[in-house]
Amino acid sequence: MSEAMSAIALDLQGVTSGYRTSVVLRALSMSVAGGEAVALLGKNGMGKTTLLKTIMGYLPKRAGTIRVNGVDVTRLPPHRIARAGVAYAPQEHAVFQDLSIRDNLRLGLADASAFDERFADVGPLFPVFESRLKQHAGTLSGGEQKMLLVARALMMRPSILLFDEITEGLQPSVIDRLAEALLWERERRGTTVLLIEQHVPFALKVADRYAILKQGEIIDHGHTNDAGAAEAIFSHLRV
């Protein structure tokens, strides 16, 4: 952990969650310090996306507690959790195709009048949008829509960012740009990040720690700068 990291920003204790007929997360406990980035890795169907949706309140908790910056959000609806300072970029594209790029970026702002100031801050990280704000988001490529989700999350200036496979299907140059944006966000604002990622080099670059999920449980974890971290991660993904 760096010196910028502080008290626990995201704390899950004994969280059990799932869908109507199935339990996916099984008494999962984990903590993320303020300013820290943790990468969640594992094969598909192991509970990673369920974990983020549970944190955001999209799935009911059957047991356990979730705290955001010390506040119990276990029973709060998604919009209240967002107001508590949590921004979520889901795996599926959540872009409003018929709205302009500008209007998509404004959606997460409590005060729409803050757009110009926020975009002046975030826009240079995503130059593809700077001259296209009036265009419909539906004109963007799949990769550009992913970047729009990330830019929208950064515009909110949250204390916690949740990202679900934001690099999936992207070109290496775009992945590098996203890594730079996340590192910038963490350095400038001390933002806490919890991200699901299958692109291991990206995870190792932007995260301080990693956790491997299997069948809704954390089966391994470590620091990304540990010798052998990459091999440990790949060994779980290969099995």
Predicted regions mapped to residue ranges:
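Conserved ABC ATPase signature
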Residues: 136-140, 144
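Walker B catalytic motif
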Residues: 165-166
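Conserved ABC transporter NBD signature motif
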Residues: 64-71, 84, 117-118, 124, ...
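ABC ATPase C-loop
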Residues: 153-154
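Helix-to-loop junction immediately C-terminal to a conserved catalytic motif
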Residues: 56
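Helical segment within the ABC ATPase nucleotide-binding domain
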Residues: 176-189
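ABC ATPase NBD coupling module
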Residues: 60, 72-92, 131-134, 226-233
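The feature captures the beta-strand-to-loop junction immediately N-terminal to the Walker
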Residues: 41-43
